[in-house]
Amino acid sequence: MSLTDTPNANRLHIALFGRRNSGKSSLINALTGQDTALVSDTPGTTTDPVAKAMEIHGIGPCLFIDTPGFDDEGELGRMRIERTWKAVEKTDMAILFCGGDTSAELSKETKEPDFTEELYWLEQLKAKGIPTILLINKTDIRKDSQALAIKVRESFGDTPVLISAKEKTGIEQIRRTILEKLPPDFGQQSITGTLVAENDLVLLVMPQDIQAPKGRLILPQVQTIRELLDKKCLIATCTTDKLPETLHALAHPPKLIITDSQVFKTVYEQKPEESKLTSFSVLFAGYKGDIHYYVKSAAAIEMLTESSRVLIAEACTHAPLSEDIGRVKLPRLLRKRIGEKLQIDIVGGTDFPQDLTPYSLVIHCGACMFNRKYVLSRIELARKQNIPMTNYGVAIAFLNGILDRIEY
């Protein structure tokens, strides 16, 4: 991804689900106009989810996800289906193929279309609030496309889109249907919310330490600056050591100061009384997750003991650095508060345990590399198991005793 590309985390995630050899990969290629996904008559060609970014007129940046067939078999097949389930957690919108190969969906007893698996997956997608487009592919070789469409409508209660991915017919209808079923709240989230308005002065305090990539800013900083520019705010920036000089140079105190969570305490002690304070991580807690649940869950820190177990989850999978906030600084703060024997497990990327019951608390990063749907799915998992879940910025503010004075 270049600096001018929309991050995948901010794209509408559209996942394709269906049986093996149903034409999911062919549709990806037809939609993107490229041979993105491997296509073969052999069932099970797609062994891992394949993602392709593209723009759709009227919608904007999208990420299409081609998943392994949910009717896969054997031990390897079971593992592939698990990958497909993981893709569901990131899905904003689904395209469900009704049937696989032209004969595979027929019941052995009745010789009628058997949509048992498709109906099960539709039920699971609906339970997660994922808008789903029903689709019948291979109309170029099916003699019963219209009859099958009637059966789908009767079984699913919705009208399918008929296409031939191979001949590229019906592709425009798919694009129109995506636009029609677009989640109404998608893309409506704001990083800074109602904290600032046009002409407000905002000061960004950004430490350029070993974690900061040389020659560029980290993604949350870039996205926040872009939003502030769109809001027509006045923006000033500085490093932590130049905060006093910067405040002195400003004609009046900033309306809002946004800092890195790891220097919360330092900035709080130096900020003007009338300036509001928050951090990039706290802002992203609301932008990507559920800030109110995070703030409520932070109180669980007070209940931790040395026999407790805490899970720290990072979206990135970078090699740990000497002063890494998630792997070094945050554990140091926790153990200083709770005790050196506090057990802390750390996971990165898509590694996230489905069973959270061994943990007294989950602390997540700002998740700038994940889409909102994926973060909310993790929060929902924690909620269902009654496990408190907060994020880096909220936890650090709590540990510094200033959470009630932080804006979000």
Protein language model features and the residues they cover:
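C-terminal effector/interaction modules appended to NTPase cores
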Residues: 1, 19-25, 215-408
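P-loop NTPase nucleotide-binding/switch module
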Residues: 1-12, 135, 152, 182-186
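Conserved G1/Walker A P-loop phosphate-binding module
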Residues: 1-78, 82, 86-89
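Conserved GTPase G-domain signal focused on the G5
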Residues: 23, 140-148, 163-184, 286-288, ...
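Conserved nucleotide-binding/hydrolysis micro-motifs of P-loop NTPases
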Residues: 44-45, 69-71, 100-104, 138-143, ...
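Conserved C-terminal guanine-recognition region of P-loop GTPase G domains, centered on the G4
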Residues: 52-60, 65, 75-159, 190-194, ...
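Conserved beta-strand segments of the P-loop GTPase G domain that flank and frequently precede/overlap
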Residues: 95-100, 134-137, 162-164, 204-206, ...
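C-terminal end of P-loop GTPase domains and the immediately downstream helical coupling element
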Residues: 164-251, 312-313
